[in-house]
């Protein structure tokens, strides 16, 4: 593969498509970040940035945030809707509401809000789904439009806090998720002397396709049926409060890959809106919820990890459907609201870490078995000589299948004591040699060979032991088989001579990344440059900005990683705005109610009992440093 080029690397890892222009591969084979896709020359190499962070005392793994990407995502989504509104002569506006559940980190929320600071009329609000989230947005929403959407199940305290938000100058929409909430809201509103802004979440009959499709449809956890919606209208009429009903909300589910699903859902919900208006409801906001997908694998397809549409098509479909429906029913066009958290945050964060070790299969020379060796070993030797000598007429794949059958029999014979350990080791090495040889003779252009190639890629893949916890940093990769782009940050100017799998440092066999973006598809192994300990490369896990931090758990007590907020200046230099230390060992012990100070007293007692006096001080110092240390590996 001497003709390998950077374009081959870009295509092989499909960077151009999943990155949306925010990340790329430079001519020297380095992965770069460019927060403004319209100015691609303004970029920074991630490996260089990682070195700068390490020199500043920030150990790997480190989660790097690029706020400029957040700004760009907000602007691009608002622009898409603004252009669609102009195109279809829609008689209202658009508001982007950020659901903070996607990423509640202070920096993330503040930077999303900061993207609208210069706007005369901000197009940004916040959504809360719990009391803690509501308390946060009550203190932050005034930095944008002061619009707050309250979703989720509610108790009296939640409702009162939302109503107090109105007294604080916010425009708070309390979305009714179940019938019992209506009475509670009206009672608390009367007590506080507040006119509530009510919303309805309706259950659509239509259900979008995807991993989160249970969020929509008639059996959804949230929302009101058609009959319940009408009952709410009747009760509001009786209370002379129908004018308080101002928002209609529905949700098809997160990561809707097919634009037709979105169009169909908007069409059904749009008829709810128009008919409720005909019944006298004063609804003036149409909240399409989430669903705007992110193209994790870059295939622009209907797969669960992709999307078959872009921002322009998304906005055009929603605006077009609502325009036609409102004209058909002769009803005013409502303000369009979307809750597009994944779209805003996914790209902005990258986890950068190091490889702590590797395990690779390298072919070894093997000798013919002794004449008195079990017949099985002679059969395996025959397969090896036939495939290596290229003089057998049998199909390559047939020989491969024979070898797999033989190695399975060898393991069975060893288990019942009919094959020695030395014989088993010889059989395994011979089988690996056959596999290695077969792989070199197969062709991707032959469709009959492809399943075997995939099998061999997995069987012969190198293992890269990577300094991170899958459960902490990529929980969706483990929990729902979400695909995240991953690739080495340097050495991509060299042809990928090996294929590998990434394993984390937890004591759990599930701690393995088992799906990788590879060209225009998903594979179980990743093509990588050959590992050179003298010139190691770092690993980057991309598009981890949505949900991963807040969903991450502390399996094996691996805690939050270090993090950094980085801006790329106009001169192409990285400016490290701020850093935040990850969890120490003492921190994670406290999470599970273990007292580090108490442990230290115990260590002192044990040292007093078991360690000679000259060593006590140094031993205690190491134990104390251990409690203060990073939960991830630092010296290896």
From Swiss-Prot:
Matches recorded under SUPFAM superfamilies: PLP-binding barrel (SSF51419)
Cofactor(s) the protein requires to work: Mg(2+); pyridoxal 5'-phosphate
Key words of the record: Decarboxylase, Lyase, Magnesium, Metal-binding, Polyamine biosynthesis, Pyridoxal phosphate, Spermidine biosynthesis
N6-(pyridoxal phosphate)lysine modification, residue list: 101
BP term (GO), one: spermidine biosynthetic process
Top-level enzyme category: lyase
Catalytic activity: L-arginine + H(+) = agmatine + CO2
EC number: 4.1.1.19
Entry keyword Magnesium: yes
Residues given in the record as substrate binding sites: 286-296
InterPro entries in UniProt: Ala_racemase/Decarboxylase_C, Arg_decarb_HB, Arg_decarbox_C, Arg_decrbxlase, De-COase2_N, Orn/DAP/Arg_de-COase, PLP-binding_barrel
MF GO annotations: arginine decarboxylase activity; metal ion binding
PANTHER family registered for this protein in UniProt: ARGININE DECARBOXYLASE, BIOSYNTHETIC ARGININE DECARBOXYLASE
General function of this protein: Catalyzes the biosynthesis of agmatine from arginine.
Family: Belongs to the Orn/Lys/Arg decarboxylase class-II family. SpeA subfamily.
Protein name in the entry: Biosynthetic arginine decarboxylase
Protein's organism: Shewanella denitrificans (strain OS217 / ATCC BAA-1090 / DSM 15013)
Gene label: speA
